């Protein structure tokens, strides 16, 4: 799957560690590195006599470390059964021997700063260092990337530069898609993908449209995760390995019993000081309490309840690699921080002759008090991974994998958090996601025209959502939850050819296919009238991507993608005698008159000779162009990029059910993203010290998405009978800047990153239910309202490596701005149910320390939210505060 820089995947395959080896003779540096890496190394000291090395600073795998130390020396290492041996490079020359240190083996972190596009990479160490409480916390600090509804689910809903949901930002796990759409009441929907962070080996993030088999429909970008493999587990020089990892964290406790109330309670209108006591009784009696006292029994900082444990084993038997892993995770209900916009009770008294009328309310970011247990933030999950890779003769290999994720978690409808007087702990929701992949690769060493990759994958997700409190009434409590089943199948084929003619050329071409099916686990007739969805969708895509390097300093890229899709709703579309329009004008009004659907053709109930179903077919062709220029060949690169992508209507958007439905006479069109970007990359060494590394990335982007698909109100002339309608609106525009600065001198390192949005606009032209054609804060009842990113967000990380790199200590500061505010008057979103969730600006401090006793044993300690801030995450659908100060202790052992 080619959705990132060439070579990044190979560089990401092996685990890395931090090293701080000072300058010395080449023999001593090699010996020191081998000792710290825990591998055997043999060489003839006389062969290296007189050669020096500037040492090794930073994070490297064993192969990368040897490559960096020996780069330009005319020597290389050869892997043998009992370790490594130094030998002369076959093509070494005298001039090469005179230069000791030059650019070494590419690391995935370095590829970010060589790519003529906005990309990011999260290594295994990054994921471990900033694990957080929720899965989405691993993306905190990544420029341009946020996670929607991070505290009210067990899944990932990634937002890249304002694009989110419905496969705008697909999350790929070993190349497979598993995204599902979950009903969130009047507040809309949430797209979710599920994976355990202990089983992730690395994450590559591409921002904006990309070519390749993995980029179909990705108008926002692609998040490509790879699961752990044998190289992550097996130490160098061995043919088997076992990794055991365990961690425990505080600031949490067992979930309370279902029905337990939380947050500010008993608000409303009451009577006091009544001349007639009975008037102050019943529903008008002044409440004795406004909170659940047991919810404030917060554990001490080092009093753990939550835990995560995993074990992974790998075996290498000649040409066969096998991996098996199991992970178990328990997250209790966490406690909110104490410092910030916590709620405070408000009292308004109106005195009358015989009584006082008292109105009790609250002011604050959410209903939860500072330091309170946040109900429904609990989860329990377990995951299993089986993986095998077989290296065949003639440079071929086959890889099979199976991943299963099961979670039981608490959550609440955002509408309950917003509107009801009491919020309560509910019974757990459940999800089981299974992913199977099979991949084949042929890369013959004697042919540069063939690098063939093909694969098939299948995902199966079963979910049960139990997220209604008893405030909604006994009838809802007794109703069985609807069990939803979601299945996806995909296949892809691609080949890369390289040749030389007026420069270097790389041609990548191929195609992909996927089919999706959604349905309810109910009998056939009953399922047709349930609120869930039932339908199928399939999509085919062909692409070609050409890269030409006419001179060392120039690189040109051009690509083209064609795709077509069909979505079909299994539910009947209209009832008897429904009138449908025969012709619709450009403004959405009916111009051709209406005809009545004959009774014998369709009906929601009873027999039907010719039922009417919603069926949408779409297609499109989109180009990508880019050019990069490295004028002085010193690591400074300038680039410009124009990238387009089509996203065909999703299965959710093409079918009837809860939240919204398409209309028979309102055709859905594909979204069309047109993104332009100019930027600069810098990757150099020896800036302030002989062995330091400086990397920087700067980008300005202008993203324009035409025919944006979202939920709206029906127009007044549309006799749809629907409360909410799925349709294309005019456009969404997002513009801004993004910057990253990364400096590593070995003993000290720092990383700064930030994103600034200077223009956000969503337009609906021609609709009857609007005040303004365009706004910067949202549209009435649109899902986009809670996908608008903050005006800015940034992070600063500073760390040091001590005791020869064994101790790594540091801190990260996260700064989050506000989103665009809704106006006090003439608010377009006030008439809808999806009113933008406003969060306050906040600053967080996280600290971490890691000590590696040996290559086989390490200990990590983190404190997240050191200053115990009370805050609401951006892009929240419901008012759920984030965790307060949380300590975490982890241990990793490798055998």
Which residues does each predicted region cover?
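Short acidic/polar hinge/loop motifs at secondary-structure boundaries
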Residues: 178-207
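C-terminal beta-signal and adjacent terminal beta-strands/loops
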Residues: 181, 646, 706-707, 711, ...
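Transmembrane beta-barrel wall of Gram-negative outer-membrane proteins
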Residues: 261, 267-408, 501, 561
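Membrane-embedded beta-barrel scaffold of Gram-negative outer-membrane proteins
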Residues: 441-442, 451-467, 628-632, 637-643, ...
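Gram-negative outer-membrane beta-barrel transporters
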Residues: 549-556, 563-565, 688-709, 714, ...
């Amino acid at each position: 799957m080619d959705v990132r820089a060439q070579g990044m995947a190979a560089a990401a395959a092996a685990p890395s560690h931090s090293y701080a080896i000072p300058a010395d003779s080449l023999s001593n540096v090699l010996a020191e590195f081998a000792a710290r890496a825990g591998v055997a190394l043999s060489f003839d000291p006389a062969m290296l006599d007189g050669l020096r090395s500037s040492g090794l600073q930073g994070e490297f795998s064993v192969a990368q470390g040897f490559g960096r130390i020996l780069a330009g020396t005319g020597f290389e290492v050869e892997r043998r059964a009992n370790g490594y041996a130094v030998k002369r490079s076959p093509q070494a020359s005298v001039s090469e021997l005179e230069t000791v240190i030059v650019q070494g083996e590419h690391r995935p972190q370095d590829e970010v700063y060589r790519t003529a596009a906005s990309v990011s990479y999260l290594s295994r160490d990054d994921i471990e260092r900033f694990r957080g409480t929720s899965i989405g916390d691993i993306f905190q600090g990544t420029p341009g990337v946020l996670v929607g509804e991070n505290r009210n689910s067990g899944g990932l809903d990634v937002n890249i530069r304002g694009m989110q949901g419905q496969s705008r930002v697909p999350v790929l796990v070993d190349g497979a898609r598993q995204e599902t759409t979950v009903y969130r009441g009047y507040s809309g929907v949430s797209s979710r993908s599920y994976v355990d962070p202990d089983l992730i080996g690395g994450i590559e993030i591409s921002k904006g449209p990309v070519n390749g088999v993995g980029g179909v429909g990705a108008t926002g970008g692609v998040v490509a995760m790879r699961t752990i493999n044998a190289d992550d587990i097996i130490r160098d020089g061995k043919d088997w390995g076992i990794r055991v990892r365990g961690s425990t964290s505080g600031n949490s406790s067992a979930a309370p019993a279902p029905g337990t109330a939380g947050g500010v309670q008993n608000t409303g209108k009451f009577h006091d000081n009544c001349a007639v006591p009975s008037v102050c009784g019943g529903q008008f009696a002044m409440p004795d309490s406004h909170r659940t006292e047991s919810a404030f029994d917060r554990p001490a900082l080092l009093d753990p309840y939550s835990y995560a444990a995993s074990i992974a084993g790998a075996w290498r038997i000649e040409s066969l690699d096998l991996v098996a892993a199991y992970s178990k995770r328990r997250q209790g209900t966490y406690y909110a921080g104490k410092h910030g916009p916590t709620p405070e009770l408000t009292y308004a008294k109106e005195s009358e002759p015989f009584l006082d009328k008292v109105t009790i309310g609250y002011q604050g970011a959410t209903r939860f008090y500072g330091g309170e247990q946040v109900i429904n933030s609990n989860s329990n999950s377990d995951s299993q991974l089986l993986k095998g890779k077989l290296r065949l003769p003639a440079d071929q290999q086959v890889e099979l994998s199976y991943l299963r994720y099961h979670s039981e978690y608490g959550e609440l409808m955002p509408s309950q958090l917003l509107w009801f007087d009491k919020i309560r702990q509910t019974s757990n929701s459940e999800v089981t996601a299974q992913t199977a992949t099979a991949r084949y690769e042929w890369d013959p060493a004697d042919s540069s025209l063939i690098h063939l990759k093909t694969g098939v994958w299948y995902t199966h997700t079963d979910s049960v959502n139990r997220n209604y409190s008893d405030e909604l009434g006994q009838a809802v409590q007794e109703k069985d939850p609807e069990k939803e089943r979601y299945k996806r199948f995909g296949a892809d084929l691609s080949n890369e050819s390289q040749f030389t003619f007026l420069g270097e050329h790389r041609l990548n071409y191929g195609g992909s296919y996927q089919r999706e099916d959604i349905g309810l686990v109910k009998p056939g007739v009953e399922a047709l009238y349930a609120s869930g969805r039932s339908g199928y969708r399939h999509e085919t895509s062909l692409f070609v991507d050409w890269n030409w390097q006419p001179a060392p300093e120039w690189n040109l890229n051009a690509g083209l993608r064609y795709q077509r899709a069909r979505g079909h709703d299994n539910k009947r579309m209209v009832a008897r005698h429904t009138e449908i329009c025969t012709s619709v004008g450009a403004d959405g009004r009916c111009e051709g008159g209406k005809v009545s659907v004959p009774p014998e053709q369709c009906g929601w109930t009873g027999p039907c000779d010719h039922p009417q179903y919603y069926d949408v077919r779409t297609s499109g062709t989109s180009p990508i162009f880019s050019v990069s220029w490295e004028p002085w060949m010193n690591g400074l690169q300038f680039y410009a990029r124009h990238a387009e992508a089509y996203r065909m209507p999703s299965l959710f958007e093409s079918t009837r059910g809860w939240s919204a439905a398409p209309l028979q006479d309102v055709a859905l069109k594909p979204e069309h993203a047109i993104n332009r970007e100019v930027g600069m990359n810098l990757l150099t060494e020896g800036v302030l010290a002989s062995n330091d590394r400086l990397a920087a990335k700067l980008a300005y982007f202008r993203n324009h998405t035409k025919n944006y698909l979202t939920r709206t109100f029906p127009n007044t002339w549309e006799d749809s009978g629907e409360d909410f309608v799925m349709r294309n609106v005019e456009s969404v525009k997002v513009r801004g800047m993004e910057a990253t600065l990364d400096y590593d001198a070995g003993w000290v390192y720092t990383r700064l990153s930030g994103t600034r949005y200077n223009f956000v606009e969503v337009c609906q032209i021609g609709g009857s239910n609007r005040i303004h054609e365009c706004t910067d804060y949202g549209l009435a009842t649109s899902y986009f309202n809670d996908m608008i990113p903050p005006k800015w967000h940034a992070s600063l990380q500073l760390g040091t490596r001590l005791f020869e790199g064994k101790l790594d200590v540091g801190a990260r500061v996260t700064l989050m701005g506000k989103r665009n505010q809704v106006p006090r008057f003439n608010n377009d979103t006030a008439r809808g149910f999806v009113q933008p969730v406003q969060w306050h600006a906040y600053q967080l401090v996280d600290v971490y320390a890691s000590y590696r006793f040996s290559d086989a044993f390490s200990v990590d300690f983190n404190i997240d939210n050191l200053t115990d801030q009370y805050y609401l995450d951006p892009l929240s659908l419901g008012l759920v505060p984030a965790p307060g100060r949380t300590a975490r202790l982890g241990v990793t052992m490798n055998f």
